[in-house]
């Protein structure tokens, strides 16, 4: 199993911290840039990653009215990233507009369109929170599936889901639908605020295409060793 299945979350506050981590973990090929770092650094961090021939998951989780989402996706697609996200709860019209805008933005910039991935349910949300806080009566696995199927119907390339839903989504959505799993925790790492996690090997065996792993690697006393341990774990997965 290739370690390019692992996307390491570059969840640091500024460009300088990001560069230090990128250079420390030279063998990492795929990095996630999220809200904190992109808000702090802007497109500069994407240029840093591209200059080092790294793949990029731009995880900004757009969630707004269709016109606004489309504009943001059109701009983001021009950066030449590999994956980007939108909340499925933005609705059908926004999802459709976003997908069309991604194609337009990439064409205008002369780059390959990124895969547009829908966030189903944040991995920090429990079934209890879904029911009590968000007032959604569906069972969490079925709600995640409904969001993924809506995204697939609107032409999106895949979905973000917890490892606990990935097997069900893989069975229903098929092999060509890209499934990205955050909330992955090795047995030796703390769960933190992740409510619905599995180990890296369990998530891949369940059907995940990519794993997003942050703190178990980046906050480890020895990040290089943590990265190697997880990579080694995945070599046993067929």
Swiss-Prot record:
Keywords recorded for this protein, A-Z: Decarboxylase, Lyase, Pyrimidine biosynthesis
Enzymatic class: lyase
Example of a GO MF term: orotidine-5'-phosphate decarboxylase activity
Source taxon at top rank: Bacteria
EC number(s) on file: 4.1.1.23
NCBIfam families the record matches: PRK00230.1, pyrF
Family: Belongs to the OMP decarboxylase family. Type 1 subfamily.
Protein name as it appears in the record: Orotidine 5'-phosphate decarboxylase
Species this protein is from: Nostoc sp. (strain PCC 7120 / SAG 25.82 / UTEX 2576)
Classification lineage: Bacteria, Bacillati, Cyanobacteriota, Cyanophyceae, Nostocales
Gene name in the database record: pyrF
